[in-house]
Amino acid sequence: MSGNSFGKLFTVTTAGESHGPALVAIVDGCPAGLSLTEADIQPDIDRRKTGKSRFTSQRRESDQVKILSGVFEGVTTGTPIALLIENADQRPRDYSQIKDLFRPGHGDYTYFKKYGFRDYRGGGRASARETVMRVAAGAIAKKYLREKVNLTIQGYTAAVGAIRAERIDLSAVEKNPFFFPDEVQIPHLEQLIMKLRRDGDSIGARLNVIAKGVPCGLGEPVFDKLDADIASAMMGINAVKGVEIGDGFAVVEQKGSFHRDELSKKGFLSNHAGGTLAGISSGQDILVSLAFKPASSIRIPGKTLDINGKAVEVVTTGRHDPCVGLRAVPIAEAMLALVLMDHYLRYKAQRG
């Protein structure tokens, strides 16, 4: 299994499983001289944490990050930064009854077919639990970009099922458990999620992520275009089934006279491209949108096969999210930060 590292100059390697003893990350390529403590990383991890509200998974992990290397006297040394988060609330017994079954919509079937073996405890390596280390690594990238480049990243939930944000108030995003920018819709979201819990079902979501202060020139055509790497990073997040940059699929119905981002002496007159042109950042805001599928771990019985090929029925037990997108905002922010950090260092290396 070789796909556990991300980036070229700013690289992140993660390891660990959903119900193993711990998860780890090695962050290599962070420049020396960045002020960094565990307190800089913890807030983003807490934003992703389960068990904070009745609307998400009730798995309760303290998720306290530990810096094991790469930092001396509160400053990065330029050597690899090792991060550790222990798993404290594992309940593998929740999966003992389905250990020989392939849960529909999960990686159980494909992992087994590829490797001939799988960790059935919550999906093992395929679990979204792994993303906590991406968030930890992303927090380092976000801090560097914010302090050294004046580049900021913020995400929010744009839609849950048919409930869409009618107004975007970014100041409201951190004030509710849904990361939702439209406070008027919060009661409707609460009702929807609680009904899904009662029904044992799930729903999809759409997230938007915005990067401001991105310098012009990031991206390496033709095979390492900035928007291509962003799309790849976002598609690597569990349950993501679609990614849009800028206007995305809406461009199908647009005319060139509308879509082209015309220029004036004051700058661009629009941003339909979402901050990149020909795979290179234009200096405008990077606009990314992600579609999350409804979680497949639900209490409604479904048809499947066991490892011997026998047709069976499965009901997924355990502690699961009615909407996996509700905890994904910090993950999407982290992945965008990792891409931009990597490309910024590559840009600096070329420019000197």
UniProtKB/Swiss-Prot annotation:
Q: How is the cofactor bound?
A: Reduced FMN (FMNH(2)).
For this UniProt record, give its keywords in alphabetical order, as a comma-separated list: Amino-acid biosynthesis, Aromatic amino acid biosynthesis, FAD, Flavoprotein, FMN, Lyase, NADP
Annotated residues for binding of NADP(+): 48, 54
Q: What is its EC number?
A: 4.2.3.5
Question: InterPro entries annotated for this entry?
Answer: Chorismate_synth, Chorismate_synth_AroC_sf, Chorismate_synthase_CS
Reactions listed under catalytic activity:
5-O-(1-carboxyvinyl)-3-phosphoshikimate = chorismate + phosphate
The alphabetized list of GO BP terms reads: amino acid biosynthetic process; aromatic amino acid family biosynthetic process; chorismate biosynthetic process
Keyword Transmembrane helix listed: no
GO CC annotations, alphabetized: cytosol
State the needed cofactors, names only. Answer: FMNH2
Keyword Amino-acid biosynthesis assigned: yes
Q: Which Pfam family is an annotated match for this chain, by its short name?
A: Chorismate_synt
Which pathway is this protein engaged in?
Metabolic intermediate biosynthesis; chorismate biosynthesis; chorismate from D-erythrose 4-phosphate and phosphoenolpyruvate: step 7/7
Which positions does UniProt annotate for FMN binding? 125-127, 238-239, 278, 293-297, 319
Give the GO molecular function terms.
chorismate synthase activity; FMN binding
What the record says about family reads: Belongs to the chorismate synthase family.
| HAMAP family, alphabetized | Chorismate_synth
Q: Which purpose does this protein serve, as stated in its record?
A: This reaction introduces a second double bond into the aromatic ring system.
Description of how the protein assembles with itself and partners: Homotetramer.
Name of the protein described by the UniProt record: Chorismate synthase
Q: Which organism is it from?
A: Coxiella burnetii (strain RSA 493 / Nine Mile phase I)
Q: What is the lineage of its organism?
A: Bacteria, Pseudomonadati, Pseudomonadota, Gammaproteobacteria, Legionellales
